[in-house]
A protein has these predicted regions:
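Gly/Gly-Pro-rich "capping" loops immediately C-terminal to redox-active cysteine motifs
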Residues: 37, 43, 47-48, 60-101
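Flexible coil segments in periplasmic/lumen-exposed cytochrome c-class electron-transfer proteins
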Residues: 17-44, 52-53, 97-134
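Bacterial N-terminal signal peptides
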Residues: 1-7
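Bacterial Sec-dependent signal peptides at the C-terminal "C-region" and cleavage site
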Residues: 7-19
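Short cysteine clusters
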Residues: 55-58
Length: 134
């Protein structure tokens, strides 16, 4: 009986309130993570996009901010839609370039959001990520 209860509770451990502002506590996290460094393929592609575009130059290697803001903090309140708008259009008045012309960003922005949301939620560790075992 205990095993069934524990296994039923396990999926809940990786869930977050992605749309907490909408008051939806059952909203699933946009990522799947195991052991802090094994993630689903979409989230892994988001991490690869982060690395390829060298976002750490402004936001820090652990997303805690440098000249750009801490994304660990920002993603606690920033909606997915606002994240998309910010990444695509940039915030030139604050020094962030628009990334809308990047094919990689267009293809992987949701994975990038998932990666950063996982970092913000404290579920994804900083550093190198690996794919979940299939």
């Amino acid at each position: 009986m205990s095993i069934a209860i524990l296994s039923a509770a396990a999926p809940m451990a990786s869930r977050t309130a992605d749309s907490a502002r909408a008051g939806d506590p059952d909203s699933a996290a946009p990522y799947t993570v195991q052991d802090g460094d094994k993630v689903d393929l979409k989230t892994l592609d988001g991490w690869k996009t982060w690395r390829a575009l060298a976002c750490e130059r402004c936001h820090g290697a652990e997303q805690e901010g440098l000249v750009g803001p801490s994304l660990v903090d920002s993603l606690k309140t920033l909606s997915k839609e606002d994240f998309h708008t910010t990444v695509i259009n940039g915030r030139p008045e604050k020094g962030m370039p628009p990334w809308g012309a990047s094919e990689m960003v267009q293809k992987n922005w949701e994975g990038l959001y998932a990666y950063l949301k996982g970092r913000s939620d404290g579920k994804i560790k900083p550093g190198h990520l690996h794919p979940l075992a299939q």
